[in-house]
Amino acid sequence: MNHLNKLMERLGHQFNNLELLKIALTHRSSGADNNERLEFLGDSVLGFIIASELYQRRPQAREGDLSRMRASMVNGDELAQMSTKLGINEYLQLGVGEQKSGGKRRRSILADALEAIVGSIYIDAGLETCRRCVLNWYGERVDDLSKLSPKKDAKSLLQEWLQARRLPLPTYEVKITGEAHAQTFTVNCYVKGLPHKTEGVNTTRRRAEQIAAKRFLELLDDGKGDGITERDQ
């Protein structure tokens, strides 16, 4: 019995070309034939599928709201959680160094692998099969799309807060540490003329910026950060 059969059962698709799934599970630290190209494709396919569902289910929503709702569905945290739920982490092929550093639990690797699998299903069986799989993974969240609230991210809210008061836009200073396969991003956020300075630390630059922006808002107005998401944009 092929060791990938259980995973294919969870994914809801039996691959015609099993090599596509194997590549989708192979991180760049493991060798040259890795999942980066499939991830690139899968990112676009996944975004299209969710955008299409939102367009159909939210006919009155504005473009900006649709974009924010899509972002909440395909951000790194959401994809990493889904990847773990599907058990993709159990099948990842990583280099020795990446394995030792806990790569099978790393959010970015899990999210990238899920996108690569989306790309592999799209190539293997086409858009409709891929759509069916993706919507099945999201489960009840798909049904909730018609009720989804378009929350703004912290960076957008901070920019709006400053613009409303005719203040300069924030500056985000980024410091990168660690090896290429395990980088840490430290972002400092400040606004010229204001005394505050906040820091956000994460394994992705975008999320570190969101964390720093959320903390800055909380300093500007106690409670301002309530309900603000720190998701990737």
Swiss-Prot record:
Q: Where is the RNase III domain?
A: 4-126
**Catalysed reactions, as listed in the record:** Endonucleolytic cleavage to 5'-phosphomonoester
Domain of life, per lineage: Bacteria
Active site per database record: 43, 115
Record Gene3D superfamilies:
3.30.160.20, Ribonuclease III domain
Q: Name one GO biological process term.
A: rRNA processing
EC number(s) recorded for this UniProt protein:
3.1.26.3
Subunit annotation: Homodimer.
What HAMAP family does the database record attribute to this sequence? RNase_III
Would you tell me the protein name for this molecule? Ribonuclease 3
Q: Which organism is it from?
A: Coxiella burnetii (strain CbuG_Q212) (Coxiella burnetii (strain Q212))
What is the organism lineage in this UniProt record?
Bacteria, Pseudomonadati, Pseudomonadota, Gammaproteobacteria, Legionellales
